[in-house]
Structures are given as structure tokens and as C-alpha cells.
Amino acid sequence: GPVYAGSEVPGKHDPPTRIGMNIVLFVLTFTSSIYWGFIQYQQFYSEELRHVLTSNPLEAPSALLGGLPFGVAVIAILLAHEMGHYLTCRHYGISASLPYFLPLPPPNLVPTLLPGTMGAVIRIRGTITSRRALFDIAVAGPIAGWVAALPILGYGLSQSRVVSTIEIETSGFYLTLGEPLLWGPMSRFFGPEVGPAQDLVMHPLAFVGWFALLITAMNLLPVGQLDGG
């Protein structure tokens, strides 16, 4: 989401700034997301549910290739969200930085459900001079992120699989995830039918879509530096 800092004369922009840090953080976040997808890919396709064969990508290049679309999906959603804020700032003549992506260490080093990133932020340097501009800038990010997330979620659900509840419970590790807004209709339309005593095992891309819907909804809360705040 956007981070407001500083002030300037409306209609003027800061001089061009170096984007080296933006590029470095982008590469690190893309890499960490691919690695997270590499782990997810192994868990989804393993014969023993949720089993990770190796944490070394060189030992499982096919799984690393499976992690690539995961990383692309994560970056696409984050980029859509932040560019929604950025382009709306430019529309109103307000100076803003390019997105700063926030990478996370590999999941085997820092156990987490986050898909290789803590998100991204832009820095708004200009003064927001009207409530209309403030509202439009705030809402543009979540809308753009949602638009990017829905096709990814739909495809991921179409590739998800159904297993027995017993298989899930005996796998040694499982999480029952909640259903953010739009998950229900998307799951019914794109996902496989889940019968009694069965559960849905999400494809890695379905998890990306699920996570995007959850974070977008949380971002709209009227709290602090969140988009709704």
C-alpha cells in the first residue's frame, strides 16, 4: 500500500531519483517467491501429501520450473496493486515513488505462510489536496490487485485436487484456511466438486489467489497506513 511522507507544492514533482534499490528489491522478491513456489510445487504434487523432497533447487529442476509461475503470479498481483496507486497519483499530479517490493527469506529458514514476500509499498511524496484524490488513490490499488488475482485464482482452482479427509489428517501437516470474499463463488465455478468426507488441496496458484483476496480485504480496513486508513 501507499506510504505518505513529506509535502510539496501541488502539481510539481521531485527530480528523477535512482531506482537501483527498487530493482534490487524486485529481484530479491521475485527470487524468494520462486523459491517458495518451488517448495509449494513439491508439496502439491508429492505422492505423500505435503512432503518436500529437497530444499535444494538444483536437485529438483522440474519443481523449480513449477515455482516460476508462482513467482510470476505473486509479482503480477503486487505490481498491479502498487501500480494502481502509482498511476492514480500521477493522474492527480502527485509525486510518488516506484514500488518497493519487500522480500522474505526462504520458508525453510523463516517458517511462514507468506508467499516469499511481505508485500510492496510506494512512497507518496506529494501533498494530497482533496478527499476525491485520497479516495481514488487508496481504492485504485485494491481494485487493480483484485483484477489481477481473479484469473490466477480461477486457474489455480481448476488445477486443484480433491482428496479424502482421512488422507489430509494423516499427512502430518495441514491447515484449514478461511474463505475470503469471492472465494466461495470462484471455488464453485472453477474448482472441482468436493463431496462428503473430502477436502480441497489448493494448487500453488490457487494459494496465491487466496492470499491476494485475503490481504486485499485486510488492506481495506480503516487502520493506520493500510489503504483503508
Q: What residue ranges belong to the model's regions?
A:
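Hydrophobic transmembrane alpha-helices and their immediate loop junctions
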Residues: 1-229
